[in-house]
Amino acid sequence: MIVEGKHIYIYGKENTKALLVIVNTFQGDGHEVYEAMQQIKSIPITLAVISDIDWNDEMTPGKCPPLYKGDSPCTGGADGYIRKLEDKIVPAILAELNGQPSFVAIAGYSLGGLFAIYSLYKTEIFSRVASASGSMWFPGFLDLSGKMKCW
């Protein structure tokens, strides 16, 4: 399905009351991630993979100049993307499921991991987070996170 210009792939939506994990990906459908998650037999999981992310904008909480020659700057569009998640994307995902999930988590790696943690400070739609190798180095993030309160 396509919502707000993002391709969304949902795996395991037949699992009623399963936990819902939302992953933002640079590109791809996340089938391999879902297959790996299926190895955890004791927990029913639904995975929603959102692709076509503008990585240097939507995953970043602030601006950052290019890190190396030929790199693009980060433009700090995370708050706008969070509003899209709240208003359109997550409701569309929930409408596709065969029941309400036990909880909704967000997971990400690199800038996606930074975004996952940042989102806990900005929205109540996620009650769990996983950040794999999150970009905690992002300029000003540690200071910013020390000033914000999680909902």
Language model feature labels by segment:
Residues 1-151:
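Non-catalytic cap/lid and distal C-terminal segments of serine-dependent acyl enzymes
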